[in-house]
Amino acid sequence: VSELRENSQLVWLHDDLPDSRVGLERRALEDVETARKILHSQGYYDGTVRHHINWEAQPPEASITLRPGERYVMGPTKLRYERTGPAGEPVDKDLPESVRGIDFMENAPDTLEAFGLAKGSPAEAQTVLNAVTSVVTAMRKAGYPLAEQGKARYVIDRSTHTLEADVLIKTGPLLRMGPVLIKEENVRPADNPDAPGAPAVNEDYLNKLSPWIEGQYWNDDLLKEYRTTLQETGLFSAIDMKPARLSPEQAKAAGWTDRSLAEAG
């Protein structure tokens, strides 16, 4: 009810009466549609919404009546994975296990229960979407920085009052953390300190600040940590960091330095 009040045309425009009956009827019908969406988002797929306008009152009074019905719960969920990139090289076995990281696909869950969507829990739309987002987030911390959601199929079973989910995840390639790539633009020549542009960045210094060990499985959290570290140096007005899709040879041809993984400037 509170969510409907917050989004109700009748409530928001209470002191701004429409010029005609048609206008008030339109507002009421818009609120009916809003109420249906709210019921569905909370798992009440059989809920009904009706409106009534008392034209005898002055000014006319409109009311919305909601009958939620039985709340649906989660039925079976299924996670499927489509490899959309090369398998990638295995992690360096010489690295200590404590720093190798994780290959998500070695023990990839096949349901959404591992991501907070238990069978029998309320079938709330936002909870379902959060669970799917959590899969992608987890993959980006475990070797798959380009993972993304593919097609998803949600089925309402009215006989059992359950919601079933079948979600496809596109994995992208399995990647490891590499050295840091710095791409500088409008850099002032070292032999001309009076020239326009920014001063050159010490690549070795920035590479030493990276929190990962080269060769471990990709982890987005480490990239975020590195971004924070770079911001704290005060050397950059803005920082853009992303997984490099180029081989070292391609990176050099594109003008990147030998030490590459992130773009900063």
Protein language model features and the residues they cover:
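Periplasmic polypeptide-binding modules associated with outer-membrane biogenesis and secretion
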Residues: 1-6, 11-265
